[in-house]
Amino acid sequence: MRHNKILSAAIALCMVAFFTIGSVPSASASPPTPVPVTITAVYDFSTLPNVTGTFTTTGALTISGVSTMHVDLNPFNGIRAHCVVTLFPSTGGTIIIDQQCQFASSPPKGRWEIVSGTGAYANLNGNGSLTMPPFTEAMTGVIYLH
């Protein structure tokens, strides 16, 4: 009889624990907040495929500095390119941006995405669209704030 009382008490405690744990709200991270940004870079294209220039940003980031870009044209048709842009803010750190571009439209256009960074920009994420008027990379999109 005593064994049944202990077993009943143990089952009751397990049930209380189960329902108590089940009612605790789960902790979930809030999704990152997209904040608009514009990145404008101006280059000297006379040294293709590796060009150098300057950049400025507005919106979610307000920085400026030196920029480099490696242009890798599609060897089959020359209409598409993959570019890697590196921004060197005057305050330190780097931001690396991958671009996928096409030259069939006027002005040429494409997409960009921040793929890495260092210093204050180590965990920076962002993406958007771009147009390429002469000598310029005009990127608009969002930076995701965590």
Whereabouts are the PLM-identified features?
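C-terminal segment of classical bacterial N-terminal signal peptides
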Residues: 17-26
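Surface-exposed loop/turn and secondary-structure junction residues enriched for glycine/proline
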Residues: 4, 24, 124-127
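Residue-identity detector for glutamine
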Residues: 3, 25, 99-102
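Bacterial N-terminal signal peptides that target proteins for export
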Residues: 1-11
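Gram-negative bacterial Sec-dependent N-terminal signal peptides
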Residues: 10-18
